[in-house]
Amino acid sequence: MVKLITVIGHGVNLLPHFIEHYQKHVDEINIAVYETELYPNLNEEVTEVIKNYENVNIIIKVQERIFDWEKVTQLYNFVKSKQKNSWYVIADIDEFHLYPNDDLRELIKDCEENSWDIVRGGFIDRIGRGGEFSELKDDVSLWEQFPNAGFFRYPMSKACPNKICVMRGYVDVTAGQHYAKIDDHTTWRWQGWNHPLIAPVKTHSVQVHHFKWDSTSIDRVLNVANINEDYAFSSEYFQMYKELKRTNFKIDLVNPEYMFELGLTKSEFSGYKNWNKLIKKIISL
């Protein structure tokens, strides 16, 4: 059995898209609801959305300070620790995985046969037509609404693009789910290269398509920046907001550093042609 865990801390607009994307890959979708003073009724909102879906459940609800990404990571690790040998997918609500050959179960089968317990991945940033921060529509595929795939957040703000995507329950992840922590060592850079428990990224890596950048994201970036706290990584968000403001809140689709491929309207792993080049870059950062 393969289980997905997601922590929801703001809004439910993406949740139907998220569920429909992952249901074909996993057996269960487990939701941790992270309520804050800004979203005090989030549990009710999530409950309303998921009532018509099978095998989608709220498994824990907490009330914490807003934008504490370290607490979010603690929730992921806490839930996974209950079944240490089980396979888990972890993904934030705006993170949509694409797997090699579009087959998660084949990926996990390879891991079991080779004694790999961790699969890494990296962000591909999605943006609307013309580089715009488009308004999210409920009845149109996300891939069609945000057809442009690239790598702009790291060049703009130096936010870490590494992600730990698939793992057994005993594997802890670090803040932001960017690296695994094994025997008190993280898998950052050389510590993760050729690690015997990590599937080789050249053949077994996950594309994390980041549908963060809709019309509401600019205000959220500013709100996190204004918290001005290390636990919220506010300095990175401030840098991102500053860069977005400088570019008139529009992403340059022809900047070669951003590695854009345009018009990718289907959820296919093979769609983004420069993936091998990009993941090699990501794990070096």
Residue ranges and their predicted role:
Residues 68-73, 99-285:
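Catalytic-site signature of metal-activated, phosphate-bearing donor transferases
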Residues 26, 84-85, 113-116:
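Short, high-confidence coil segments that cap the C-terminus of an alpha-helix
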Residues 29-35:
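Short internal beta-strands
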Residues 4-6, 31, 118:
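Structural beta-sheet core signal
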Residues 1-20:
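N-proximal low-complexity "stem/linker" segments adjacent to membrane-targeting elements
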Residues 37-91, 98-99:
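Active-site-proximal specificity loops/subdomain of glycosyltransferases
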Residues 20-29:
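Short, acidic, metal-binding catalytic loop of nucleotide-sugar glycosyltransferases
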